[in-house]
């Protein structure tokens, strides 16, 4: 069914369950219950009693994000004035919506780029993001993938480039 979310895992040798390492969204039974509804409303429920471990979520036929800014051009590298931030520490509510609400303040500082410390999935909920797992998934602790796209779109509308810190060589643990 188009737009419906489905959870799945790979079952290996009849007893090892793994989420898809290329998953754009996961369910984590140990950490998702600590994410508030204001940050990640209507989360897909974890299939308690049916499996264990991290579950991949896919949504075939999902509506693509409708970008307001489709022609953004980033500043030349030599002209970048970058503000690096960690969503969790920069705004008290630690979510993309509150970050969007502070973009005018950041713009007044004279910057033209925001560098996000790694926003991808990482183990637990409290981290700088330098312990990544599931490199294609954004960590739900900061908000939904749609809200992240809205953040990028809002930055571009103000002339701000968005740089995402990625640390593939730091992967460990559940990765």
Predicted segment positions?
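Short, flexible loop/turn elements at secondary-structure junctions
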Residues: 86-91, 120, 139, 168
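Alpha-helical scaffolding segments of alpha/beta enzyme cores, especially the outer helices
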Residues: 101, 150-153
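Aromatic-lined carbohydrate-binding/catalytic grooves of carbohydrate-active enzymes
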Residues: 105-147, 160, 171-172
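N-terminal small/glycine-rich loop or linker at the start of catalytic domains
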Residues: 74-90, 131
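The feature marks proteins involved in alpha-glucan
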Residues: 2-80
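Hydrophobic faces of well-ordered beta-strands that scaffold small-molecule active sites
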Residues: 81-85, 114-116, 162-164
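Aromatic- and acidic-residue-enriched segments that line the glycan-binding/catalytic groove
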Residues: 22-41, 126-138, 170-175
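Short, acidic/polar
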Residues: 93-106
């Amino acid at each position: 069914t188009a737009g419906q979310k489905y959870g799945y895992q790979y079952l290996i040798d009849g007893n090892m369950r793994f989420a898809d390492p290329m998953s754009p969204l996961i369910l984590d039974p140990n950490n998702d219950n600590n994410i508030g509804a204001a940050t990640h409303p209507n989360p897909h429920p974890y299939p308690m009693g049916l499996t264990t471990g991290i579950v991949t979520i896919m949504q075939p036929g999902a509506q693509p994000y409708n970008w307001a800014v489709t022609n953004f051009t980033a500043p030349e590298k030599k002209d970048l004035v970058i503000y690096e931030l960690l969503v969790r520490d920069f705004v008290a509510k630690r979510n993309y919506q509150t970050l969007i609400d502070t973009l005018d303040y950041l713009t007044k500082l004279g910057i033209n780029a925001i560098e996000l410390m790694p926003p991808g999935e990482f183990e637990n909920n409290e981290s700088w993001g330098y312990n990544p797992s599931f490199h294609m998934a954004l960590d739900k602790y900061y908000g939904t993938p749609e809200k992240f796209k809205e953040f990028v779109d809002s930055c571009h509308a103000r002339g701000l480039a968005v740089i995402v810190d990625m640390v593939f060589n730091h992967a460990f643990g559940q990765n």
